[in-house]
Amino acid sequence: MYSIEVRTHSALHVVKGAVVKVLGSEAKWTYSTYVKGNKGVLIVKFDRKPSDEEIREIERLANEKVKENAPIKIYELPREEAEKMFGEDMYDLFPVPEDVRILKVVVIEDWNVNACNKEHTKTTGEIGPIKIRKVRFRKSKGLLEIHFELLELENPS
């Protein structure tokens, strides 16, 4: 069984994939993330507040991906090789220091690719249900904050 922080961190990747599916590639750049216990915040560069319908769809798609129990693959690769395989989309707005030569790249197939050195669950099903609690658009900075929490796992093993 994974710690709640590992599950919540893994949920960031699932939520991010849903955000990009619903809002488009304009929302692909992560500005910041935050995890504490079962609560997480994903902050992306974006130019507007999503509609209530879009927010519901992000939550629905994220939970669909959790139910799918998709594998979360981790590749540990030389930086140059990772950049050839995954391109700039694996990066966030906060840069990976230049002296880091080996990258861990988290891949949820056809959903999310991200250079990330944190621990993750092996599948999306191990994350548990995701509930979006608050969405805040900071117009002056062009940032969209998505606050979510993990609900209890239905069948913890």
From Swiss-Prot:
GO molecular function: aminoacyl-tRNA deacylase activity; aminoacyl-tRNA ligase activity; ATP binding; metal ion binding
Keywords: Cytoplasm, Metal-binding, Zinc
Any single biological process term in GO: tRNA aminoacylation
Subcellular location: Cytoplasm
Textual note on the cofactor: Binds 1 zinc ion per subunit; the homodimer seems not to bind zinc. The zinc is probably not catalytic. Another report suggests the zinc is catalytic.
Family annotation (InterPro entries): Alanyl-tRNA_Editing_Enzymes, Thr/Ala-tRNA-synth_IIc_edit, tRNA_SAD
Gene3D superfamilies linked to this entry: Threonyl-trna Synthetase, Chain A, domain 2
Binding locations of Zn(2+): H9, H13, C116, H120
GO cellular component, one term: cytoplasm
Cofactor section: Zn(2+)
Main location (coarse class): cytoplasm
Purpose: Functions in trans to edit the amino acid moiety from mischarged charged Ser-tRNA(Ala). Has little activity against Gly-tRNA(Ala).
Quaternary organization: Monomer and homodimer; the dimer is less active in tRNA editing and does not have a zinc ion associated with it. Another report shows only a monomeric form.
Family: Belongs to the class-II aminoacyl-tRNA synthetase family. Editing domain AlaX-S subfamily.
Listed name of the protein: Alanyl-tRNA editing protein AlaX-S
Organism: Pyrococcus horikoshii (strain ATCC 700860 / DSM 12428 / JCM 9974 / NBRC 100139 / OT-3)
